[in-house]
Swiss-Prot record:
Compartments where found: Cytoplasm
Gene Ontology molecular function: kinase activity; protein-N(PI)-phosphohistidine-sugar phosphotransferase activity; protein-phosphocysteine-sugar phosphotransferase activity
Gene, per the UniProt record: gmuB
Principal subcellular localisation of the protein: cytoplasm
Upregulation: Up-regulated by konjac glucomannan and by cellobiose and mannobiose, the possible degradation products of glucomannan. Repressed by glucose via the carbon catabolite repression system. Also repressed by GmuR.
GO cellular component: cytoplasm
Annotated EC: 2.7.1.205
Name this polypeptide is given: PTS system oligo-beta-mannoside-specific EIIB component
Record: active site: 8 (phosphocysteine intermediate)
This protein's domain notes: The PTS EIIB type-3 domain is phosphorylated by phospho-EIIA on a cysteinyl residue. Then, it transfers the phosphoryl group to the sugar substrate concomitantly with the sugar uptake processed by the PTS EIIC type-3 domain.
Keyword set includes Transport: yes
Protein keywords: Cytoplasm, Kinase, Phosphoprotein, Phosphotransferase system, Polysaccharide transport, Sugar transport, Transferase, Transport
Length: 103
């Protein structure tokens, strides 16, 4: 099962995207645990994830979060702006999968 963490300022703006990503994963027959947290819980929760996507408003924290993620051998990336704005679950899910290629 793929485990994908989404983080944004409060965890609210990514909740719709989480739903859309889950729907897409289910539609292609994949099992995925996808959840959202606020930026204050991102470092704590990332140890349970295979990939971390962060909201565009958190892009300034990417390098700090990646340093933390390195100890768990996971990648952190800013959610594609179009996928984020359009709540495109397919695009965001595929972005998360691309971060897991080397695992």
């Amino acid at each position: 099962m793929k485990k994908i963490l989404l983080a944004c300022s409060s965890g609210m703006s990514t909740s719709l995207l989480v739903t859309k990503m889950k729907e897409y994963a289910q539609s292609i027959g994949e099992e995925a645990e996808i959840w959202a947290v606020g930026q204050d819980k991102a470092k704590e929760d990332m140890r349970k994830a295979d990939a971390v996507l962060i909201g565009p408003q958190m892009s300034f924290l990417k390098s700090e979060l990646q340093k933390e993620a390195d100890q768990y051998n996971i990648q952190v990336e800013v959610i594609d702006m179009m996928a984020y704005g359009m709540a495109d679950g397919k695009k965001a899910y595929e972005q998360a999968l691309s971060l897991m290629v080397n695992q």
